[in-house]
Amino acid sequence: MSCFSSRLGASCGVRAFSCASACGPRPGRCCISAAPYRGISCYRGLSGGFGSRSVCGPFRSGSCGRSFGYRSGGVCGPSPPCITTVSVNESLLTPLNLEIDPNAQCVKHEEKEQIKCLNSKFAAFIDKVRFLEQQNKLLETKWQFYQNRKCCESNMEPLFEGYIEALRREAECVEADSGRLAAELNHVQESMEGYKKRYEEEVALRATSENEFVALKKDVDCAYLRKSDLEANAEALTQETDFLRQLYEEETRLLHSHISDTSVVVKMDNSRDLNMDCVVAEIKAQYDDIASRSRAEAESWYRTKCEEMKATVIRHGETLRRTREEINELNRMIQRLTAEIENAKCQNTKLEAAVTQSEQQGEAALTDARCKLAELEGALQKAKQDMACLLKEYQEVMNSKLGLDVEIITYRRLLEGEEQRLCEGVGSVNVCVSSSRGGVTCGGLTYGTTPGRQIASGPSVTGGSITVMAPDSCSPCQPRASSFTCGSSRSVRFA
């Protein structure tokens, strides 16, 4: 019986797989050959592999030497209808140097752990897909809600525009009233200026009248002083006249006393006789007449001036009273107009403040609405981006799931093909490994290996290649051709 061995090396630090089988036993002999193996995986960095050993014949296989991998025994082909005597060569009982890897049990345990890890990852991917589907439904619900909400929020802008237009019309009315009040204020100010000019003229006339009154008073004082001087002069003249009269009487008495003692006969002309009494009386009469006329003239002039001054004072007092009444009336009118102007200004200020506040509130509301709209648009855009990311992740998860499904199917087909070859007999197997990017086409098996290496059948075993030798008596098994695409970058083709 011929034995074949296979070895697959990897440069990336991963283990390869090996299989050892015996096909077509010769009568009376049993041969089991095995080679150390290393597992191979479709994922980089994932160590481990699998090994199988079966015996085609009417007996079950047994272990020789150290155990390795996992054992499987089976019968290939139909069993004979009856049990025949089996003769065993005793030389086969001697221990064989099979060069079995002592770490096969650890490798098997690692393979089981890796399969468990892959199953856990697959379950995690399925849970993630379900979670992403739920998130997708939630995002679709939010999207519909935001669309309906956008339609409802679009009615706010016309409402604010109408409110702002009403406030603008009110502001225009207030501006018109302000213009009218300003015109009235200008008219009142002009009237006030006219009254002010008249008041100033009246004040000037009053000052002129007072000056005239002072001048007339000075004239009256001068006339009174002149009258006093004249009275003093008249009194002085009267005293002087009395003194002269007394002096004349005394001289006359002395003369009479001297004459009484002498008697003289003198012839005198009576026409030359000086009558002092008449002269004095005449002079006195003249002075009295002059004084009385001066007094009468001064009194009449004083009375006339006093009457004129009284009339002027009464007239100016009446004019001043009327002017004061007009000034008081103008002051009351000015105060009333000033109060009305202040009230109008306060009302205008309040209306302007209300308009400004309304505009600010409207602008704030519009800004808030725009901000909310921008936030909603940003949230919508973010939701779209999240949905796109989730869809991308979902697609990646589905691609990973497809790759895992393909890998599982490939492992299953590989195991089934291996069992079938062990049962039916193994012929020549050509294994071709090629590297590719983006897709894998295989005839029933997919592995990962180093890029740029090819594995071909032949009699030699080199690093990074597989050499499979089978006897001519075993017909080659033809695996079913299948083709699929996954995200692996390397392929193994069996032909």
Swiss-Prot record:
Is Coiled coil one of the keywords? yes
List residues of the IF rod domain: 111-422
The record's PROSITE patterns line, in alphabetical order, gives:
IF_ROD_1 (PS00226), IF_ROD_2 (PS51842)
Return the annotated region ranges for Coil 1B: 157-257
Matching InterPro entries, A to Z? Answer: IF_conserved, IF_rod_dom, Keratin_2_head, Keratin_II
Query: Where does the record place the region Linker 1?
Result: 147-156
Chain segments carrying region Tail:
419-494
Q: Give the similarity note.
A: Belongs to the intermediate filament family.
Keywords attached to this entry: Coiled coil, Intermediate filament, Keratin
Would you tell me the protein name for this molecule?
Keratin, type II cuticular 87
Quote the PANTHER family the UniProt record gives: GATA-TYPE DOMAIN-CONTAINING PROTEIN (PTHR45616), KERATIN, TYPE II CUTICULAR HB3 (PTHR45616:SF52)
Q: Where is this region: Linker 12?
A: 258-274
Q: Which GO terms describe its cellular component?
A: keratin filament
Q: Where is this region: Coil 2?
A: 275-418
* Stretches for region Coil 1A: 112-146
Keyword Disulfide bond among record annotations:
no
- Anything else known: There are two types of hair/microfibrillar keratin, I (acidic) and II (neutral to basic).
Q: Where is this region: Head?
A: 1-111
How does the record describe its quaternary structure? Heterotetramer of two type I and two type II keratins.
